[in-house]
Swiss-Prot record:
<dbReference type="GO" id="GO:0039657">
    <property type="term" value="P:symbiont-mediated suppression of host gene expression"/>
</dbReference>
<comment type="subunit">
    <text>Homodimer. Interacts with host TRIM25 (via coiled coil); this interaction specifically inhibits TRIM25 multimerization and TRIM25-mediated RIGI CARD ubiquitination. Interacts with human EIF2AK2/PKR, CPSF4, IVNS1ABP and PABPN1.</text>
</comment>
<dbReference type="InterPro" id="IPR004208">
    <property type="entry name" value="NS1"/>
</dbReference>
<keyword id="KW-1192">Host mRNA suppression by virus</keyword>
<dbReference type="GO" id="GO:0039580">
    <property type="term" value="P:symbiont-mediated suppression of host PKR/eIFalpha signaling"/>
</dbReference>
<keyword id="KW-1103">Inhibition of host pre-mRNA processing by virus</keyword>
<keyword id="KW-1090">Inhibition of host innate immune response by virus</keyword>
<feature type="region of interest" description="CPSF4-binding">
    <location>
        <begin position="177"/>
        <end position="212"/>
    </location>
</feature>
<feature type="short sequence motif" description="Nuclear export signal">
    <location>
        <begin position="134"/>
        <end position="143"/>
    </location>
</feature>
<dbReference type="GO" id="GO:0030430">
    <property type="term" value="C:host cell cytoplasm"/>
</dbReference>
<dbReference type="GO" id="GO:0003723">
    <property type="term" value="F:RNA binding"/>
</dbReference>
<keyword id="KW-1190">Host gene expression shutoff by virus</keyword>
<dbReference type="GO" id="GO:0039540">
    <property type="term" value="P:symbiont-mediated suppression of host cytoplasmic pattern recognition receptor signaling pathway via inhibition of RIG-I activity"/>
</dbReference>
<keyword id="KW-1035">Host cytoplasm</keyword>
<dbReference type="GO" id="GO:0039502">
    <property type="term" value="P:symbiont-mediated suppression of host type I interferon-mediated signaling pathway"/>
</dbReference>
<keyword id="KW-0945">Host-virus interaction</keyword>
<dbReference type="InterPro" id="IPR000256">
    <property type="entry name" value="NS1A"/>
</dbReference>
Amino acid sequence: NTVSSFQVDCFLWHVRKRFADQELGDAPFLDRLRRDQKSLRGRGSTLGLDIETATRAGKQIVERILVEESDEALKMTIVSMPASRYLTDMTLEEMSRDWFMLMPKQKVAGSLCIRMDQAIMDKNIILKANFSVISDRLETLILLRAFTEEGAIVGEISPLPSLPGHTDEDVKNAIGDLIGGLEWNDNTVRVSETLQRFAWRSSNEDGRPLLPPKQKRKMARTIESEV
């Protein structure tokens, strides 16, 4: 159920944190660790549960499972699970950099938050993202950001810590909303090759998204009206 799932997630995060404290984690591992911490705090607040207490309970659940699990069953489980890959357009610095908006606009779409600076006009913009892929489909979006040619961040799509879980279609719709909002101000938006392949296939050869004018106007109005 929801509580036991949260307890197990807390304990597994604790194990991963101990691993990271020994300087054994790579950049994607550390990135997920930091973002999962925010997610757990949000879930704990929503459920009204203390994270330390939940971690202890999660440890007991995991220990009970390990006692009952045979080595052979564990091997079969691992083999049968499809492998996920972590893909990165952005460096750790690009992901963790703070940014500010002169004319902030924000929309919540399901478990995703879309933010953009409406003051940005007549710029060439590229969308970059870090996310995991499983069976050639986007599994989990970690973070998507919109960059100008000068490297300034002007937009972002991020999962809400208190509402975990989204589909590749949710991400694609959010990308469409962000593109529509940026193009409303006569910006030229391109999508990274990685995003084109796994999350946004409606692009021409140079990576520019193909959005009808009516759809662009609708998306821009949607972002503006929901702030």
